[in-house]
């Protein structure tokens, strides 16, 4: 998610401070999001999608991937749990 945000921002010639101002977040936090040290709160996704002129669904999918990874990556049985979730969702 963060890498894609940085890619979009740089592609549009925008500065961190411009995204920060649009989302009412400080530059340091946006930098941590781009460097994948923090996850942007979900409530900011719609405004970010509008600001960057990208489909909300694109950002939401990437955001969910990172959110899920952050939950299970430190769990010894995370992959197994994810398999059960996928199986359950396919019912």
Residue spans of the language-model regions?
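Short alpha-helical DNA-recognition segment
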Residues: 13-32
């Amino acid at each position: 998610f963060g890498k894609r945000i940085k890619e979009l921002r740089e592609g549009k010639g925008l500065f961190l401070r411009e995204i920060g101002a649009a989302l009412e977040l400080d530059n340091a936090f946006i930098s941590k999001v781009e460097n994948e040290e923090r996850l942007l709160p979900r409530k900011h996704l719609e405004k970010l999608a509008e600001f960057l002129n990208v489909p909300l669904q694109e950002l939401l999918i990437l955001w969910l991937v990172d959110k899920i990874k952050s939950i299970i990556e430190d769990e010894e049985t995370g992959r197994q749990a994810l398999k059960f979730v996928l199986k359950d969702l396919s019912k």
